[in-house]
Amino acid sequence: MGCCYSGETDTGKGDQGEREHLLPQSQSLPNKAPNESEQNSTNNPSARTDEQAMLSRILAKTAQNIIDVSAVESQGMEQHECMDRARQYSTRLAKLSSNLMDWKKVPPLPSLTSQPHQILASDPVPFADIQQVSKIAAYAFSALSQIRVDAKEDLVVQFGIP
């Protein structure tokens, strides 16, 4: 932003507007004691006008650098426009979320052991064991597929309620 006076010299680093002096170095405001403030303003009107001119320049420079964000967004947005936009956004969001349901997240693999490197480094499972497990799974599948329920009597019994 700026400073009134600094003893540091400009090294050329950073933003030039940051190092720029708001008050010229040749002019400095006189130091006033608390009791002298009223006397100086009445005795020296030219000093007061110089101060006013410097202050007005500082205010003008500051006003140029300020961006009022609240005024920018609120230009012309009425309530029905906000409601229309909200409806439009919600329909778009509903379309996107329905598309996301198709892409179900694949569950991660279960963690069967805390040391998978030992399992991967061990000997592979023998082929005979794999055949035995496959045969048992086939028998279990055929047994489950042959289960039938035969209805021998009615499941709902009518009571003699008139």
From Swiss-Prot:
Positions with an attached lipid (S-palmitoyl cysteine) read: C3, C4
Q: How is it modified after translation?
A: N-terminal myristoylation and palmitoylation mediates its recruitment to lysosome membranes, thereby promoting localization of the Ragulator complex to lysosomes. N-myristoylation by NMT1 is required for palmitoylation at Cys-3 and Cys-4.
Region (Disordered) residue spans: 1-54
Membrane-topology descriptor: Lipid-anchor
- Basic and acidic residues bias locations: 10-22
GO-annotated biological processes: cellular response to amino acid stimulus; cholesterol homeostasis; endosomal transport; endosome organization; lysosome localization; lysosome organization; positive regulation of MAPK cascade; positive regulation of TOR signaling
Q: Where is the lipid attached (N-myristoyl glycine)?
A: G2
The chain's coiled-coil residues are none
Q: Which domain of life, per UniProt?
A: Eukaryota
Any one of the GO CC terms: late endosome membrane
* Function comment: Key component of the Ragulator complex, a multiprotein complex involved in amino acid sensing and activation of mTORC1, a signaling complex promoting cell growth in response to growth factors, energy levels, and amino acids. Activated by amino acids through a mechanism involving the lysosomal V-ATPase, the Ragulator plays a dual role for the small GTPases Rag (RagA/RRAGA, RagB/RRAGB, RagC/RRAGC and/or RagD/RRAGD): it (1) acts as a guanine nucleotide exchange factor (GEF), activating the small GTPases Rag and (2) mediates recruitment of Rag GTPases to the lysosome membrane.
The protein's matches in PANTHER family, at most eight in alphabetical order, are given as: RAGULATOR COMPLEX PROTEIN LAMTOR1
Q: What is this protein called?
A: Ragulator complex protein LAMTOR1
Q: Which organism is it from?
A: Xenopus tropicalis (Western clawed frog)
